[in-house]
Amino acid sequence: MAAKPEQDCKTAAALIRAGSLIEGVESAGKDFLVWTTQGPAVKKDPDLLFSLCRVLPGSTQQTLKLQQVEPTADSQELTVQAKEVWQANPGIDPLTYGDIGGLPHTNEPCVLDFLARRYQSKVIYTTAEPLIVAVNPFQDLKNAGPDTIALYRDAPDVDKLPPHVFYASRRAMTNMHQLKKPQTIIVSGESGAGKTETTKMLMKYLATSAGGNLDLKIQTAIMAANPVLEAFGNAKTVRNNNSSRFGRFMLLDVAREGGIQHGKVVAFLLEKSRIVCQDKDERNYHIFYQFLKGAPGHMRQRYMLQPLEAYTFINPHCLDAPGIVDTEDFEQTVKSLESMNMTETETCTIWSIVSGVLLMGNAKPTGKTEAGVENAACFVGESEAALRNACSLLFLDYPSILHELTVKTTYAGSNKIESRWTVPDSEMLRASLAKGMFEQLFLWIIRKLNADIEPKGGSFDVFMGLLDIFGFEVFQNNSLEQLFINITNEVLQRNFTDIVFEKELQLYSKEGISSKKIEYTTNEKLIETLLGKGTSVLAALEDQCISPSGTDEKFVSSLASKLAGNKCFIPSKNTKSLEFTVVHTIGKVIYNADGFAFKNKDVLRPEIIEITRASTNDVVRGLFEGVKVEKGKMAKGMLIGSQFMTQLKGLMEVIQKTESHFIRCIKPNDDKVPLKWVNSKVLIQLHALSILEALHLRQLAFSYRRTFEEFAAQFRFINLGVSNKPGADAKTICVELLKSTSISADEYALGKTMVFLKPQAAKMLVRLQREALSAWEPLVGVFEGMTVLKRAKQLSTGRAVPATRICANVRRKLVQAGIKVC
């Protein structure tokens, strides 16, 4: 389900970065355009976020008087503060710019307006170097056919072609084979943004050989498994009804001439806590609803299925998802399992485990005093029956599982000591068993797929990697899941920042410019705040989860104490509140720690893993294959947070060995209709996908770069005396144009073929150019009048008056420009 419009508006508004004196007002102060959040149109439709206004006389750098001109003209005069104003890019044709970074201003409203106008012209790809931004068109634009593939595959210089996902494919393939280095194309975005379609397009390009042949074997195998992976790994969240709750990394063996020869799928960071609890407006994984709604009578009986409302692990407040027909999807999942060469026994085991995981939630322990332990866990009545049936469905020995859920075993040296688990302890063990069985079943399905598509030995010398992963998440209620997802994105952001500046250094080196002029900051301090040893958010959570008396309240209190004075962390002003704020790369995110400790405790004891390995079922025996067990120890490594960090570390180790390319997918509206653009919806994603951050990183050094010829042509009107100097080459003109301004030498650099400018220098040149052109405005009306006279061929003596005026004005302007006149 899409997020409520008012929620998007509030979230987007909170993310907007304040304007500034520099961006808000120019010293000329003459009738120029700006964006503001205070326009009448925004008051009427908050989704707009910004409206375009004209600055009126009487404005100062602190306070501006405005009049709205877009989306509709309004005579109302506004008085706003500079922090509520952002400069616009008047006169810019968005179709002539392939790279957002080439715009004079790249503030939030300018980027939104630029992308919106391109999108409404059906131009969905844009560069925000080194990113490619892809906006979901919700229609077939016929831009991915054989002709388009051939255009990008065969072009002598692909850099001269418009932005496209095929550009990323071509560049990655070329680098892979020429440099013999693995490549990764990272595709990110929220559900519905077009990640799946983008990945399919990338695979289509990679599978097409230079001779026009299409090798569909591996692509078909992977796509056939996609409904199964989505059923087990996707769920309805408050923002999206088909949200991928895991990261997917595909390794592809691509021939030099094109064609996918082998492949492998690796799953990262499955959101296990969702299996046992969901927020009010969210669902569990799709597979549960497909099975319970779509299974025929004989399956319902065989797998002991009950109504949805009967299961504790199913949120009763959200049983359906708009746009999803669970019964139809169940049929598709069944067909996909068959296409994956599953045996009948394997398929039956899958359904049995799915049912058993759900039923395990109904096995609720109750307390009694036993062996000197108050509230000792035991299972009686319906709970005992549920546990017995769940074990049967999971192919686990019931007496053994019952023992592990009620009897606590510890070791003192070689001595074995038994006592009783309390009810809360038993509930955590039961939940961990359910989560572990489901997660390992999901991974087993992927291993089964890989057995059919990966090369012999399972290793790749050089590969093309496709990473499909979620971006930053900012909800109205942000829990442990959002914290883990946002930590993942911060780590990816650090990698991204390193790559951006590595490319900057390469360009500077090529152009002969000192890299000492690059100044930038990283999110290293933030990552240390989130993940550092001893004093960090994750460390504090792990400490509380290990402690017998640990609670969410103590966790939040510990954070406030340990991170006091840390600029990346803001405690709640209410000491009784479970909320805390982290200052992420994308802005401030408020987390609610209610349930953090419970969600993080994934204490699947070694004894329980050993029970699965003693199962009579072949599939169940192999579920925990490769999982190390060590009896008698309960450590941080068993917690979800630790497992998450292990997987994240593994993902980054793979990515860092490759050369990365980035595609950011944008969902322009929740209605999935063509040409509809919702600013509030898009702005959240621009932050979440680090698109604005990419532009910000470029602003930190010489963000503007043009060839000498392009620079001389763009800013020729600043000083016509220099621009029209006879015999001067482009570089000489550039140097003299810059010297004729007040721009200091440390604000620009001259390379071998290009001019590099810092952001404020580029903005000053734009202003000087506009002032120069504005000074010529009196001549416009005169020339228009002369044109009319000429066309009418009126040869009266009255014509001499406008001619005289023209000559006088032209002579005056030429003298001002330093051009000698007779």
From Swiss-Prot:
Record keywords, A-Z: Actin-binding, ATP-binding, Cell membrane, Cytoplasm, Membrane, Motor protein, Myosin, Nucleotide-binding
InterPro entries assigned to the protein according to its UniProt record, in alphabetical order: Kinesin_motor_dom_sf, Myosin_head_motor_dom-like, MYSc_Myo14, P-loop_NTPase
Domain of life: Eukaryota
Primary localization: membrane
GO cellular component: cytoplasm; myosin complex; plasma membrane
A biological process from GO: actin filament organization
GO molecular function, one term: actin filament binding
SUPFAM superfamilies for the chain: P-loop containing nucleoside triphosphate hydrolases (SSF52540)
SMART domains, sorted: MYSc
Residue numbers spanned by region Tail: 772-822
Binding site residues for ATP: 189-196
Family to which this protein belongs: Belongs to the TRAFAC class myosin-kinesin ATPase superfamily. Myosin family.
Subcellular localization: Cell membrane; Cytoplasm
Membrane topology: Peripheral membrane protein
Region (Actin-binding): 660-670
Primary role: Myosins are actin-based motor molecules with ATPase activity. Unconventional myosins serve in intracellular movements. Their highly divergent tails are presumed to bind to membranous compartments, which would be moved relative to actin filaments.
Organism: Toxoplasma gondii
PROSITE patterns, A to Z: MYOSIN_MOTOR (PS51456)
All copies of domain Myosin motor, residue ranges: 95-770
Name of the protein: Myosin-D
Entry's free-text remark on domains: This protein differs from the typical myosin heavy chain structure in having head and tail domains but no discernible neck domain.
